[in-house]
Design a protein with these regions (language model features):
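Short hydrophobic alpha-helices that are characteristic scaffold elements of the AMP-binding
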Residues: 136-142, 162-163, 279, 288
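Conserved pre-ATP/AMP-binding loop-to-beta segment of ANL
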Residues: 82, 189-234, 240-241, 261-270
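Conserved AMP-binding/adenylate-forming core of the ANL superfamily
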Residues: 84-119, 124-136, 153-158, 208-209, ...
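AMP-dependent adenylate-forming
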Residues: 71-96, 229-232, 239
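A cross-family acyltransferase "interaction/gating" segment
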Residues: 1-42
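Conserved AMP-binding loop of ANL adenylate-forming enzymes
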Residues: 120-123, 263-289
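Conserved ATP-dependent adenylate/AMP-binding module captured primarily in the ANL superfamily
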Residues: 135, 150-181, 198-203, 207, ...
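Conserved structural elements of the adenylate-forming
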Residues: 99-105, 212-214, 245-266, 274, ...
């Protein structure tokens, strides 16, 4: 028997201290998953494996009802609109609401620069507010984010571009001056240009969208498919040609949910982006957690 949903309930030890940080929900949703009968002489590891398989089936079914990264971001922003969300060492600070508005503005500006063939888009940015917003904007436009490893060798860097098929890269002029990258894609979009000339009317209209519009009015239909690829990560390529891993929305959300079960984070906590966004933990643990 596997009990689904017990972690996070009022009587669980999720959070910092029992009975804290829980919103009382009545009735509280629980799932009881019953497997096939097992012999009374079953070994401990066999029982454990059977329970784990039931748990996997539960999370697979529960995950299919939670939407994609795009829908999760909008739901979270609307629920915690004024909560601090992202900041960096340049003293840029955004709440969840402002981050969503900025991401939607950035997405709409990127639509003018990208075409239908640009399904995968390269990102060459450090761990900063701008880098996070670009990842959010691409997710909100149903595109694939490819965070490129700017510490890799030129051969590994070029291989990642070739394998992912990206034709355009989003970067920063200031950042390019600090790193040793010889060649990029044929088309380069600078984030400094994307953030210019947003009118007050654009900001007001986007704020209303972010706060009030139904999700189907904001997001492309593809954004509701959690089986679509959300990001491509590459190995470092230090010992062989870099290997690319396609991560779906389901993959990333499952990793986030697994992390939340062992890391008792609350709205009062922050996560330091000690690892870059081209790193598996940097992507999952600091952008989407």
């Amino acid at each position: 028997v596997y009990l689904g949903g017990a972690w996070g309930s009022l009587f669980s030890h999720a959070g910092k201290g029992r009975y804290r940080n829980h919103r009382l929900r009545v009735p509280y949703p629980m799932h009881v998953n019953i497997g096939n009968p097992m012999p009374s002489n079953s070994q401990t590891h066999e029982v454990r494996l059977a329970v784990q398989e039931l748990g996997s089936a539960y999370h697979e079914k529960a995950g299919s009802q939670k939407g994609s990264l795009s829908t999760a971001m909008i739901r979270s922003a609307r629920q915690f609109w004024r909560q601090p969300f992202v900041s960096d060492t340049t003293d840029k600070r955004l709440t969840q609401g402002k981050a969503l508005i900025s991401s939607l503005l950035l997405r709409d500006r990127l639509k003018e620069e990208l075409n239908a063939e640009d399904e995968a888009v390269g990102i060459l940015l450090p761990s900063c507010v701008g880098g996070a917003l670009v990842n959010f904007a691409l997710a909100l436009d149903a595109r694939i984010a490819v965070n490129l490893n700017f510490t890799a060798s030129s051969q590994a860097f070029d291989s990642a571009i070739r394998q992912s098929g990206i034709k355009v890269t989003i970067t920063s002029r200031a950042f390019l001056e600090k790193i040793e990258i010889q060649e990029l894609t044929d088309r380069v979009i600078f984030i400094e240009d994307l953030g210019k000339d947003f009118s007050a009317l654009d900001k007001i209209k986007t704020a209303l969208k972010a706060r009030l519009y139904p999700m189907p009015w904001i997001l492309p239909t593809k954004c509701f498919d959690r089986t679509r690829t959300a990001s491509i990560l590459f190995s470092s390529g230090s010992t062989a040609e870099p290997k690319g891993i396609k991560l779906t929305h389901h993959n990333l959300m499952s990793n986030v949910e697994a992390a939340m079960e062992v890391i008792p984070l609350s709205s009062r906590d922050g996560v330091a982006a000690a690892l870059p966004f081209f790193h598996s933990f940097g992507l999952t643990g600091t952008i989407w957690l």
